[in-house]
Each structure stands twice: as structure tokens, then as C-alpha cells.
Amino acid sequence: MKFGVIVFPGSNCDHDAFYAVTANLGQTAELIWHDSTSLGDVDAVILPGGFAYGDYLRCGAIAKFSPVMSAVRKFAGDGGLVLGICNGFQILVEAGLLPGALIRTRGLKFICRELRLRAATTDSPFTNAADPERVLRIPIAHGEGCYFADERTLDELEAEDRVAFRYIDNANGSLRDIAGVLNRERNVMGMMPHPERASDPLMGSADGLVVFQSMLQAGVRA
């Protein structure tokens, strides 16, 4: 399986994601610059964490206009797997590919720590290898990662089983403990925790590898 990792000016987790899917997952990957108009022959796309365009105006608000995002939208529309991690999640929300918003954390502080969470569904290409009973230890690192949506949207996410991950330790104040969500077609997911930073035992946890393993399983079945 070939992963495309999008690189925006200000991305700082692109090489982490690249390493996770190559060294830890054993797959191939390509770094794709923000001004590219094509994704090439990739099977899945990752929008990594960081501070795209300095997070000016609002996190992801400028990145959504990058030339590569037209290709990402088409890729997603054609059913391709798209994963947004942290800043990547914020970009997907700004681009209208995922519902809701990511706002300032509870306490208005940047939070960098390992949290406990669980997969809230296994019915997705990003969580099919997960055990919903297993507690995952995956770090967060954000100042604007509190998931917010109106009650109607939250109820829709619940009813349609589109909450991908929930915090056990809800440090940022996300509504209904939401750590990750899916689009209606279930081929796009955004999550604020960093699975690429928990994909190697040397990092203290390999729990995040389940996200990439799930994508691989979904790709093999497809």
C-alpha cells in the first residue's frame, strides 16, 4: 500500500507519519508538497500535524486553499482513504470534508501529554483492527483541539456511528469526549491525538499503529 503524506508550509509531523507507515508498518510512502495538483498513484492520504501556514487566521483556514487540497477533495470524493491528524483534522474541517470545528482547549492552554482513549467504532477503514474494549495510550499536542459541533450534528454523528475515537481522559474539553470523527461515506477521518507518535515501542507506546494497520487491512480488502 502506498501512502501520500501532504506537506504544508509549517507541517512538522510529516516525517513522523512517513516513518510510521514505512519503518513501522512496512509500506511505501511519498511526501507530497502543498502546491502539487496531483496525488499520483497513492492508495491513501495523510494530512499530518503541525501549524500549516503558521495557523494564521484560524487553524487550517489558509491550508484549505492550497492547490493540493483540490486533489485531496477529488480523491476523497472517489472513495480514497484520507486521514487528518491534529492540524490535518483542522484542515479537513475547514475544507468541509468533516463536520464540526476545533476550538481552543479548555483552560485556553496548549496541551502536550499522553491521553487514554478508545475506538468508538470498528466499522471504518481506520478502526477495523481496533478492540473497542482496549485502552489506547496516544499523545495529543494542540492548543485548538477541542471538538465542537451543534447538538444536531453531534446527535447525527452518534446515530450514524461516526464517532471514531473517544477520550477517556478528556483534557481539552471536547464535546461528548470526541477525539475523532468520520465523514458520512466513512472514508475520511480526522483525529486530534497523534497515532504516528505512538507507533513504535521505543516511543513508549505502539497503540497508535492500529490506525495505520486498519487502513492497510481496508486497502487489502479493497
Where are the model-predicted features located?
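Amide-donor transfer/coupling interface in amidating biosynthetic enzymes
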Residues: R73-G77, T105-A222
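Active-site metal-binding loops of divalent metal-dependent hydrolases
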Residues: G50-F51, G88, G143, P195
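N-terminal beta1-alpha1 cap of cysteine-dependent amidohydrolase-like domains
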Residues: M1-I85, V93-I111, R118, L175, ...
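Short, flexible active-site-adjacent loop segments at beta-strand->alpha-helix junctions, enriched
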Residues: G88-F89, D123
